[in-house]
Curated annotation (Swiss-Prot):
Its EC number is 2.4.1.17. Homodimers. Homooligomer. Interacts with UGT1A1, UGT1A3, UGT1A6, UGT1A7, UGT1A8, UGT1A9 and UGT1A10 to form heterodimers. It is found in: Endoplasmic reticulum membrane. The chain crosses the membrane at residues 490-506. Residues 1-27 form the signal peptide. UDP-glucuronosyltransferase (UGT) that catalyzes phase II biotransformation reactions in which lipophilic substrates are conjugated with glucuronic acid to increase the metabolite's water solubility, thereby facilitating excretion into either the urine or bile. Essential for the elimination and detoxification of drugs, xenobiotics and endogenous compounds. Involved in the glucuronidation of calcidiol, which is the major circulating form of vitamin D3 essential for the regulation of calcium and phosphate homeostasis. This is UDP-glucuronosyltransferase 1A4. Pfam families: UDPGT. It is a single-pass membrane protein. Keywords: Endoplasmic reticulum, Glycoprotein, Glycosyltransferase, Lipid metabolism, Membrane, Signal, Transferase, Transmembrane, Transmembrane helix.
Length: 532
């Protein structure tokens, strides 16, 4: 009995010693303000892992949404929107329809700008409603969050973080109008860094560099209608003039969904972290339904076809052209499509409303990937080493496709102009030409050869900001005027000195010349006068 007591006491001592040695871990509070649509898919993975590390997560989303739904690893707090579900769906439907209209007509351009204006107004009005919801703002203030995690493509989350005086972490692909470069004060020379949406590479001709330099000017109107309402709202809230850069410079860390395996080399700042491929991490087993499709494909394997979460219906004529092309290859095609079934759909093609894209791309029988070139799909293609046929539709997709094509890992087609034969030939090329597989496997090997996985890196930096209450180095460039940033005042000062020295030197030389040669000339002239 005495022995049993001693054993029990010894166990208690060991437990106390262990508790003394181990650091106390206390979960923090994370406020997430997501951008709806596909950006939420990456943010969602970070939220899942942050919750798994013992932190409380509150996701703040609008009542009217596409993808943001409550789940067991976060608490969803919704706020009222000044528009109905019907209004929102109608606007999004019009935007989808614009994708498949000729892009070079003036009418299409005007309609696109009008839809963008309406969408921007909905977003800014929704943000106004959120920030003027006094009970909700009071609740958020009292919750004492340690960090705000948001995508600054929609500036509402960044503005809310600044308004609550809470450190923020941005997770993004890019921001329109180079605002990500301005917000980080990262050098951005137009001579070799292609502007997003220009479809330029980092090796540009003279005319491409002209386009690259002028493109920000052409985007001014888009920036004005997209982001100026947020600057006005911020100025109203803070009772002083607040610029977009003021809002963005509040961020402690910027998590870019990029990787230099895909993107072109460029300067970066200390608080810029690259987590491209973050959506490749979580992979579940293939379901029996899709396992059956794959096993039935035989030696030819499968082709995965998806235009992303935003677009799953296309015009009937174009759908029939695509169906005809898919019937010309021996592979089994799994096509994520919710529209009307094309009447000419071949036996080798299966329509599904949803597919486990990342899991299917990782299967050894997958031969090719038909994608709209969204960043999620592109990185999943790279992670799994699958050559791609790219049908870019809008936004950064054209640039993503250009990057893959320049690396010899895929073929790009214009979805509006391509024929059935074009698509079939592109598929046969990337499947049968071994160079495409070799190039994508090389990219995959480079991308995966890293000390820390992208998802783990993202979670680390979120916790870093929580531990240190921000603590990111703030570039002094934020405190400079535009002419100080470009050293124009210094250049002007030095130029003034050079001109002054040159002027004084010239005057001195002129004076000396006059003294030395002017007098001699006058003497000679006087001598000649006496002779005559």
């Amino acid at each position: 009995m005495v022995l049993g007591v001693w054993i029990t006491l010894w166990r208690l001592v060991r437990l106390l010693l262990l508790l003394c040695v181990l650091p106390w871990a206390e979960g923090g509070k994370v406020l997430v303000v997501p951008m709806d649509g596909s950006p939420w898919l990456s943010l969602r993975e970070v939220v899942r892992d942050v919750h798994a590390r013992g932190h409380q997560v509150l996701v703040l989303g609008p009542e009217v949404t596409m993808h943001i739904k409550g789940e067991d690893f976060f608490t969803l707090q919704t706020y009222a929107t000044p528009y109905s579900k019907e209004e929102f769906d109608q606007l999004m439907q019009r935007n989808y329809q614009m994708i498949f209209k000729p892009q070079h007509s003036l009418k299409t351009l005007l309609e696109t700008m009008e839809n963008l204006k309406k969408f921007s107004m909905l977003c800014s009005r929704s943000c106004w409603e959120l920030l003027h919801n006094k009970p909700l703002i009071k609740h958020l203030n009292e919750s004492s969050f340690d960090v705000v995690l948001t995508d600054p493509l929609d500036l509402c989350g960044a503005l809310l973080a600044k308004y609550l005086s809470v450190p923020s972490v941005f997770l993004l692909r890019f921001i329109l109008c180079d605002l990500d470069f301005e917000g980080t004060q990262c050098p951005n020379p137009s001579s070799y860094i292609p502007r997003m949406l220009t479809m330029n590479s980092d090796h540009m001709s003279f005319l491409q560099r002209v386009k690259n330099m002028l493109y920000p000017l052409m985007m001014k109107y888009t920036c004005h209608i997209s982001y100026d309402p947020y600057a006005s709202l911020a100025s109203e809230l803070f009772q002083r003039e607040v610029s977009l850069v003021d809002i963005l410079s509040h961020a402690s860390v910027w998590l870019f969904r990029e990787d230099f395996v895909l993107d072109y080399p460029r300067p970066i700042m200390p608080n810029m972290v690259f987590i491209g491929g973050i959506n490749c991490a979580n992979r579940k087993p293939l379901s029996q339904e899709f396992e059956a499709y794959v096993n039935a494909s035989g030696e030819h394997g499968i082709v995965v076809f998806s235009l992303g979460s935003m677009v799953s219906e296309i015009p009937e004529k174009k759908a029939m052209e695509i169906a005809d092309a898919l019937g010309k290859i021996p592979q089994t095609v799994l096509w994520r499509y919710t529209g009307s079934r094309p009447s000419n759909l071949a036996k080798n093609t299966y329509l599904v409303k949803w597919l486990p894209q990342n899991v299917l791309l990782g299967h050894p029988k997958t031969r090719a990937f038909i994608t709209h070139s969204g960043s999620h799909g592109i990185y999943e293609g790279i992670c799994n080493g699958v050559p791609m046929v790219m049908l870019p539709l809008f936004g950064d997709q054209m640039d993503n496709a250009k990057r893959i094509e320049t690396r010899g890992a895929g073929v790009t087609l214009n979805v509006l102009e391509m024929t059935s034969d074009d698509l079939a030939n592109a598929l046969k090329t990337v499947i049968n030409d071994k160079s495409y597989k070799e190039n994508i496997m090389r990219l995959s090997s480079l991308h995966k050869d890293r000390p820390v996985e992208p998802l783990d890196l993202a979670v680390f930096w979120v916790e870093f900001v929580m531990r240190h209450k921000g603590a990111a180095p703030r570039p002094a460039a934020h405190d400079l005027t535009w002419y100080q940033y470009h050293s124009l005042d210094v250049i002007g000062f030095l130029l003034a000195i050079v001109l002054t020295v040159a002027f004084v030197t010239f005057k001195c030389c002129a004076f000396a010349w006059g003294k030395c040669f002017g007098k001699k000339g006058r003497v000679k002239k006087a001598h000649k006068s006496k002779v005559h």
